């Protein structure tokens, strides 16, 4: 409803990952999942990352998401390697991850739970590994297009005037509609870097009523290296 739409907005990428609250007090780090279960042992790489920060006492709200070798976002199903690996280092090898910090609940001993997001931002912005964001509503559509082109799920729209809520239902999510289409591959291009020897981008089209085709865009994500090689 329009009455619930925030007047002061912050727009961030929507990451296809898992939400974790990370507590650090000096060399001690604890990672909680959204059910409050301690999962620190699954993420030795994240522990190493946050203990490298100059800030030594904090509580942050984050999204941890799987990435491909080139740093692009991978399918969430890859996270099962983290959740179910008996050996943490094996999980790290099978499922490299990245961290996006989107909120701060405590900074150097200062509690921020009752502070509006627009005021928490001054603390959030002190951290590395922040979520990608814009605050100008005029940038929403271009930022959404950028998120999709980079392989992210879409965008989150948040109220800058809102205090912290653990199970926030006031955030708005915008993702591409999920529909099934019968498409035809009308062209293909070789990729860059490690994919320079395979066809890694495919032009897609749908048929029209005259028996021709209408281009609808290109796709280059969702395939494994073996699938790219097979299609080439």
Residue ranges and their predicted role:
Residues 10-19, 23-127, 182, 198:
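Covalent nucleotidyltransferase
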Residues 1-35, 89-96, 120, 125, ...:
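Nucleic-acid 5′ end/cap handling module spanning
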């Amino acid at each position: 409803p329009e009455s619930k739409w925030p007047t002061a907005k912050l727009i961030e990428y929507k990451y296809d990952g898992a939400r974790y609250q990370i507590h650090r007090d000096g060399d001690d780090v604890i990672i909680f999942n959204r059910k409050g279960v301690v999962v620190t042992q699954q993420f030795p790489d994240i522990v190493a990352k946050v203990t490298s920060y100059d800030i030594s006492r904090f509580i942050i709200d984050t999204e941890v998401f799987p990435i491909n070798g080139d740093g692009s976002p991978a399918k969430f199903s890859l996270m099962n390697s983290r959740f179910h690996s008996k050996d943490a280092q094996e999980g790290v090898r099978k499922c490299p991850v990245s961290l996006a910090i989107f909120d701060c609940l405590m900074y150097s001993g200062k509690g921020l739970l009752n502070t509006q997001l627009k005021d928490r931002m001054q603390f959030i912005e002190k951290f590395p590994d922040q979520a990608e964001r814009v605050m100008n509503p005029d940038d929403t559509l271009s930022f959404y297009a950028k998120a999709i082109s980079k392989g992210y799920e879409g965008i989150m729209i948040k109220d800058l005037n809102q205090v912290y809520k653990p199970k926030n239902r006031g955030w708005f999510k915008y993702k591409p509609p999920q529909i099934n289409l019968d498409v035809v591959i009308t062209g293909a291009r070789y990729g860059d870097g490690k994919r320079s020897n395979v066809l890694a981008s495919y032009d897609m089209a749908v048929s029209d009523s005259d028996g021709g085709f209408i281009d609808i865009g290109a796709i280059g994500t969702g395939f494994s290296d073996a699938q790219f090689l097979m299609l080439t």
